[in-house]
Amino acid sequence: MNKVFNLNTLALSFLVPSSIICAAKCDNKNANNSYLEKIASRLVIEPTELIDFKSTDPKNVISKLNVENLPLGYEISYIEIKPNGSVIYSLHKTGSDQEPQTFEYKIREDAVAIDKNTRLVYKKDSYYSSLEGLNGKTLFDELLKLQQSKIRGIKTYAYLYNVYKDAFLDKYYEKDNTILDIYSENPKGQDPYYFTYEFHEGKDADGSSGKSRSKSGEGSKYNREHIVPQSWFGKVEPTRNDAHFIFPTDKIVNNERGNYPHYIVKNPTFISRNGTKVDKTNGICEPIDEFKGDVARAYFYFVVTHNNSSSNDLFESSFPYITKKYLEVYKKWSNQDNVDAFDIDRNNAIARHYNGLRNPFSDYPELIDLIWFKTDSKFHNKGIAIAIK
């Protein structure tokens, strides 16, 4: 019994495989009610948001249930909401004297939710449970505490290359599984050059030395680009080894960028072959539009995870920890370049390598507003983002 759901009609909807749907008849007093059984077998009862059935008042659960495939002229009444996610309900024909029939519908405990506003698909998970109901500085402080409890999973500097084999593959543009380099990728046409894994600088964690193309300029090899430069935090470990903000990029462009922060460049002194701009006069670098959100979310990640930079230009020593001009531009970049499949896949791949450590802004881009822009909204845990719908 395979169901096809119209997810555009839902706010936060559970994807429930038909194999776990239980529309079992609990009371079969009248054999003439076989049609009710047929209706019940087709019903889809879904929460309109992620619900913890064990701790939520059943009355509140009922208000958050949506029913699909109920024929015109029939109605249901809820009898009981069980802590295991079972919904007991009666089904009957409207205005009929026929005795209602009782059925049970079981919702899988680890169901997946879809956020209508961002189109992110979430898997139920407790990673962010400690942030529930928080915002502002309180949310920041709790998130920093959470992230710093996870950084022990970060591995060595050489191991960054091993992470890149999983987390930074081009499955989205040329789809050729080459290394996805934000300083050379051309999202609107042919890449000026590309890197397969082995063209890295130095050795990986397996002791394998990288290769180099015999050419000058861009395209010879890639290395490890710290979005937040190492000199800003004294190269301390494990910070300098964290792939969530250290990307594989062309060595030449990396060198041209140096230790400049990313910002808006009006008068570039260098432009890479994919359009990345560097202004050495003012000491800033601007990525192409396609990756501005990725870069911005890497900076936000650094602040809520490591928060140990001594840079006096971009970072501050007290909340909000990012100077106003950068905070506003990075928010704009994140909004313009929304979380996409590259963000989601990268976040989950790195988490697998780092014993679960995640970039919260790839899971919840709204954290930028919830922490720094004083909205009335509060954080709600939907789990971890696993896909784009």
Task: Cite the ranges covered by each PLM segment.
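Non-membrane alpha-helical secondary structure
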Residues: 31-35, 57, 123, 131-136, ...
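N-terminal module-boundary/linker segments of secreted carbohydrate-active enzymes
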Residues: 110-192, 367-389
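Short acidic, gly/pro-rich beta-turn/loop elements at beta-sheet edges
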Residues: 99-101, 192, 260, 371
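Beta-rich interaction/scaffold domains
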Residues: 1-114
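Short, charged N-terminal helix-start/capping segments
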Residues: 28-40, 147-153, 215-233
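Domain-level detector of nuclease and nuclease-like folds
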Residues: 210-389
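Short, His- and charge-rich active-site/binding loops that engage polyanionic ligands
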Residues: 186-215, 220-221
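Short, surface-exposed loop and linker segments with low hydrophobicity and enrichment for Pro/Ser/Thr
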Residues: 78-84, 163-179, 287-297
